[in-house]
């Protein structure tokens, strides 16, 4: 069984993330979405809330499991018996950072591959931070995040 991990902060998960997850599941037998504790970022949603949101919006995608993790990504990938790390690329600007990370991960775990998937064109501008900013100002985020996420965001910012 070929397992991949798809790590991220997912604060919140967007339709761009879901696009990558669906496509990764078509390549691998199982995809573990790793929600990072990420002690280096101030998140809008707690780790538990982010895990629950990701679980909610991926519940109907066969082959997907959702787990939280902290520490090195390669250690998480090894615990999950993954053969690959999946990363989404929105633009060339993402590639430089992701390329450096993939080299470091390869140094730490030479048997682990990194697979880059280009985000669908309609989501190439999308990021969690853009979604948070738009939602906080009352902007329309419909169609950019799953309905469950839209509801939670609007409620968090006092628009529901």
Curated annotation (Swiss-Prot):
It comes from the Bacteria. Its cofactor is Mg(2+). One of its GO terms (cellular component) is cytoplasm. InterPro entries: Cyt_trans-like, PPAT, Rossmann-like_a/b/a_fold. It is an enzyme of class 2 (transferase). Belongs to the bacterial CoaD family. PANTHER family: PHOSPHOPANTETHEINE ADENYLYLTRANSFERASE. This is Phosphopantetheine adenylyltransferase. It comes from Moorella thermoacetica (strain ATCC 39073 / JCM 9320). The gene is coaD.
């Amino acid at each position: 069984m070929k397992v991949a991990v798809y790590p991220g902060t997912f604060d919140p998960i967007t339709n761009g993330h879901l696009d990558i997850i669906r496509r990764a599941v078509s390549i691998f037998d199982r995809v573990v979405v790793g929600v990072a504790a990420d002690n280096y970022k101030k998140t809008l949603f707690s780790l538990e809330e982010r895990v629950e949101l990701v679980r909610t919006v991926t519940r109907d995608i066969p082959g997907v499991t959702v787990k939280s993790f902290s520490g090195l990504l390669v250690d998480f990938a090894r615990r999950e018996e993954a053969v690959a790390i999946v990363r989404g690329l929105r633009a060339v600007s993402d590639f430089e950072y992701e390329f450096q990370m993939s080299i470091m991960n390869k140094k730490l775990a030479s048997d682990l591959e990194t697979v880059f998937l280009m985000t669908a064109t309609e989501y190439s501008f999308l990021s969690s931070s853009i979604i948070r900013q738009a939602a906080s100002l009352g902007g329309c985020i419909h169609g950019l995040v799953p309905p469950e996420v839209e509801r939670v965001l609007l409620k968090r910012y006092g628009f529901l």
